[in-house]
Amino acid sequence: MVVTAELNLSSAKTIEYEQEYSAHNYHPLPVVFSRASGAHVWDPEGKEYLDFLSAYSAVNQGHCHPHIIQALVDQASKLTLSSRAFSNDCFASFSKFVTEFFGYESVLPMNTGAEAVESALKLARRWGYMVKKIQPNEAIILGARGNFHGRTFGAISLSTDEEDSRMNFGPFLENVTAKIPGGSDDEFIRYGEIDDYKRAFESHGDKICAVIVEPIQGEAGIVVPRADFLTDLQELCKKHQVLLICDEIQTGIARTGKLLCYEHSPNCKPDIILLGKAISGGVLPVSCVLSSREIMDCFTPGSHGSTYGGNPLASRVAIAALEVVQNENLVERSARLGKFLQDELVKLQHESNGVISEVRGKGLLTAIVINPEKANGRTAWDLCLLMKDQGVLAKPTHEHIIRLAPPLVISEEDLLKGVDSIRVSLSKLPNVPKSHH
């Protein structure tokens, strides 16, 4: 039997085939991407949209950035994969480049963000037994309520999302949790609340090997902690010989107006950093764990690995993606445009008659919160559908929050178009038919 792929599908056929043949583990907005450039996306019929999601901050450098694509094309004709059974020159170059770029001593290459998280959990446990001398099988890793670190078992063991991430997936990993050790089943470490960490450390500090935290919680709805939270948390971790792991997979690579989001916190440098998404500019799956040589050396040959991690194609693409961040001053651009966008959104909030209850974020990682009572019972999903009709694409997180995170290369003019589309959509929101999402 010869099978032939149908290419160049229409929007309708794309949605039909996806519904019929793929797993139903996502509920996408009814729009189809066919091509993209910078902050602009086109569907198969040629309709143009502004992208205000950036593939969950994976395309910070803009869709199909020519410098990154050229690196991909050049390397693809030379060597794409060696596995780590052998060395390849691109990974060696990437290792030196990425550690110097972010100011760490050692890198572990992986592919997806979830793999980076799992790798860090393994590394932290191994460090806990080898260096901190925690008794066998007793090491604890703590998360925080509202966290999102992926959907693997390690990540959902940390999660507090009982409806989506955890339902019908138990039992979860022992001692990998957002619960306060020794507390009741419904006592979680509250994000940003240093006293909850103190309570956990005072009772179980000798068994805790690591704390993993997002500098800003993304999937929770762009939740920004107080400015010195990470500084205080790291000080507490050092006091109890606990590793601080910062998940920068969504917040890193210039997204928040700093190269890495933790840099907003004074006198803070996490022990382990996790990167993914925009480290490849959205071109290939690339992720990594960055740490000190002392911590990373807890991994020995055979203790961890990945066939594709550190492959030459991904390594070359990641170098090019970080070069774009550097050469195009995307950190400064994100800070400047982020302030511009948030100022415009605050103006819109004041015009919204209470429909927008809050604007929050840092840099170009922003969110608006919808008050359903003022919106006649309509949700963020309803607003996103209206925005789509106005040519702007965003996605809700939870029922009443919309994350707004356009590519960092977006122009002020397009940012204003995006805000105007929200304004028009808000005027229609109270009377639009309710969706059944």
From Swiss-Prot:
Gene3D superfamilies: Aspartate Aminotransferase, domain 1 (3.90.1150.10), Type I PLP-dependent aspartate aminotransferase-like (Major domain) (3.40.640.10). Pathway: Amino-acid biosynthesis; L-proline biosynthesis; L-glutamate 5-semialdehyde from L-ornithine: step 1/1. InterPro entries: Aminotrans_3 (IPR005814), Aminotrans_3_PPA_site (IPR049704), Class-III_PLP-dep_AT (IPR050103), Orn_aminotrans (IPR010164), PyrdxlP-dep_Trfase (IPR015424), PyrdxlP-dep_Trfase_major (IPR015421), PyrdxlP-dep_Trfase_small (IPR015422). Disulfide bonds: none annotated. One of its GO terms (cellular component) is cytoplasm. Its cofactor is pyridoxal 5'-phosphate. Belongs to the class-III pyridoxal-phosphate-dependent aminotransferase family. GO terms for biological process: arginine catabolic process to glutamate; arginine catabolic process to proline via ornithine; L-proline biosynthetic process. Its EC number is 2.6.1.13. It comes from the Eukaryota. This is Ornithine aminotransferase. GO terms for molecular function: identical protein binding; ornithine aminotransferase activity; pyridoxal phosphate binding. The keyword Transferase applies. The gene is CAR2. It catalyses: a 2-oxocarboxylate + L-ornithine = L-glutamate 5-semialdehyde + an L-alpha-amino acid. Keywords: Aminotransferase, Pyridoxal phosphate, Transferase.
